[in-house]
């Protein structure tokens, strides 16, 4: 063997060992690295074997499925009737198109790839005989007792004339915990003295392997069927037909499965779910594409680990590892000092991030992160990236503890908690701390307040740092002469630029706005858009709000004691009142005419609107609901009363159907607004 070949073999051995190790950890509930890091290792090993076929051996990790049942498992081993294969993955559009080109079909099925735990069910003459984990694809753990307490798994299949129950039926499915149930499952676990689960997948995996049946019952496990194994007396012509039969027998199938004939539509489905992955009732990390026709599936066959007739498109990871370079703090608009991680840039959930929140110093200690650690970060959708914790095994002794500052990094004021048991430390210098002032300016310029388009983060910081504004009270008195000292709103020649002129124009127009937006812009702690709408809707002027007794304020729907007290406390401060006085003198809305109060036809109702409506904008439909006493919610749950479906409605419509909620079109919604009833 040449030196080059020897080096290649060493590289292969190293990669194969890492893949085997992390695969075993994953399938036996002790993952050390995010899925994306494992996928990258696996793909690297696959590529090495493709480039050097002589390296591949029959027991290579690229040739096997899952992982052997752990030696310390407390469950009995059980053989699957038919091998339980895995899926090959693609990670970008070109790889998907290549697979579609190699795998032509009259029809494909697209299904969400549930991020849960695989399960194998065997029914004989309709009776549930046993349930097992995937294991290594041939042998899994016998978890029949636990499966019997999952409500979605029927003990007895119900046959029909069209779909008689077969003599033997092996079902493949996925066990999971819904996104909605996960916080409550964690709350129960903490109440029972346990540590919270990191994510729903870990919760499902840990729950399914519990020996205590009562603990399993608490975990709200769900199951969706996504395939068949061995059968006797059942020969469907297509995957779609198989799903119809499963549903008829009482086995749950995915509400998100769709039939597609054009490969271009497959690509579009991948793109759609990339943008809507958080609309599903469960966590998902990809889209599975299957050839629908079962005769074609048989003709295509499978490799030693995966069928050739199916592929999983994996979305960009939401959990990855990177290096924690430093921990710094930022000062928010209410004085809250928040630590954040400065990291080596890393691609996560489709975007490159180099900073992530650490919430507060208690969280830094609880998570046990050290500067210099390799850390796991998570970014879900538009949520700010968060550090989940360190990879302790990768520490080399150079890491160091983070010391939380005692002084504000923006103004030097001594930090303190607002009250004794507060986990957040704050800078009490609210009046003149530049960090607080600039973030308050940015906030009041947002769409939820004055909507001042020309006043962004850089502009706000510039107005404060240059001394053009001492606080927000002078914002509406700004002139072109004031802006001549700006670095953002002037040209190189020292004249006010287009952005500066736009800022002054925006300020004039934003003076006449809704009263609730003015309340939001004041940055009163706890007073967000919902409370502001409620207060403005009841009192109609700033002065009436100031004069209202605390108890009366707290009785306002959507307000309560904490918000009411915070409101009262804010107006006890002289410089706060000076802001309101200067804005009023500049012509900012301080009261609004009391128009005809809309009939409270939606009082006590929670309504979700999904998709576009012809007669409403997004803001106006929300206003229509709130002004009639209803709650405009952004998520569908069992507590939702109505779901209004418009053009291009997303998966919220599907979830509403699954939960059996009342669904309305636009005409029904208008009837509900006008009469309190959606019936014709």
From Swiss-Prot:
PROSITE patterns: BRCT, DNA_LIGASE_N1, DNA_LIGASE_N2. Its EC number is 6.5.1.2. CDD domains: BRCT_DNA_ligase_like, LIGANc. Residues 597-680 form the BRCT domain. It catalyses: NAD(+) + (deoxyribonucleotide)n-3'-hydroxyl + 5'-phospho-(deoxyribonucleotide)m = (deoxyribonucleotide)n+m + AMP + beta-nicotinamide D-nucleotide. Belongs to the NAD-dependent DNA ligase family. LigA subfamily. GO terms for biological process: DNA repair; DNA replication. SUPFAM superfamilies: BRCT domain (SSF52113), DNA ligase/mRNA capping enzyme, catalytic domain (SSF56091), Nucleic acid-binding proteins (SSF50249), RuvA domain 2-like (SSF47781). It comes from Corynebacterium glutamicum (strain ATCC 13032 / DSM 20300 / JCM 1318 / BCRC 11384 / CCUG 27702 / LMG 3730 / NBRC 12168 / NCIMB 10025 / NRRL B-2784 / 534). Pfam families: BRCT (PF00533), DNA_ligase_aden (PF01653), DNA_ligase_OB (PF03120), DNA_ligase_ZBD (PF03119), HHH_2 (PF12826). One of its GO terms (cellular component) is cytosol. The active site is at residue 113. Keywords: DNA damage, DNA repair, DNA replication, Ligase, Magnesium, Manganese, Metal-binding, NAD, Zinc. The keyword Ligase applies. Its cofactor is Mg(2+); Mn(2+). PANTHER family: CHROMOSOME TRANSMISSION FIDELITY FACTOR 18, DNA LIGASE. DNA ligase that catalyzes the formation of phosphodiester linkages between 5'-phosphoryl and 3'-hydroxyl groups in double-stranded DNA using NAD as a coenzyme and as the energy source for the reaction. It is essential for DNA replication and repair of damaged DNA. Zn(2+) binds at residues 408, 411, 427, 433. It is an enzyme of class 6 (ligase). One of its GO terms (molecular function) is DNA ligase (NAD+) activity. Gene3D superfamilies: 5' to 3' exonuclease, C-terminal subdomain, 6.20.10.30, BRCT domain, DNA ligase/mRNA capping enzyme, Helix hairpin bin, Nucleic acid-binding proteins. This is DNA ligase. HAMAP family: DNA_ligase_A.
